[in-house]
């Protein structure tokens, strides 16, 4: 796939698989994301993937579209995780991430509400509200492949900051 095809694919996509690693142990988990040039934005509650990305910010995200065994597309992004904490210097980027993610789906509200409910059940006397955790993956490389009955499989690869 060409660079433009990869970018257009990511702009249409919202579901991918995030790969991270800690102490030579890989971990892959499905995520929802929003794409803007050079970045993927995501939302999470604290857990294993956040712990691991904090210790090793090098990550990959794969997103695909499969119609059948001979007609599919796949884009893999490699990049660097950055947490967007609830602090004034990150507020603009957090707002952008929230706006982009809310445009596409409200799945995170259910997950976030469930996490708050579990917290209240395990700690009934504490009513702490844990703020949502937004993050950015700075895209440093991208490859795309596709297969279609009447086309030749294509691939583009590039490194460094994308423009």
Spans of model-derived segments:
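Charged, gly/pro-rich active-site loop segments
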Residues: 69-163
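Short solvent-exposed loop/turn micro-motifs enriched in small/polar/acidic residues
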Residues: 11-13, 25-26, 74, 128-130
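Beta-strand-connecting loop/turn residues
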Residues: 38-39, 57, 140
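Short, basic/aromatic recognition patches
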Residues: 1-17
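Short beta-strand segments
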Residues: 13-45, 61-62
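Active-site-adjacent structural patch at catalytic or cofactor/ligand-binding sites
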Residues: 45, 55-64, 71-82
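Short, solvent-exposed aromatic-acidic interface loops
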Residues: 45-48, 101
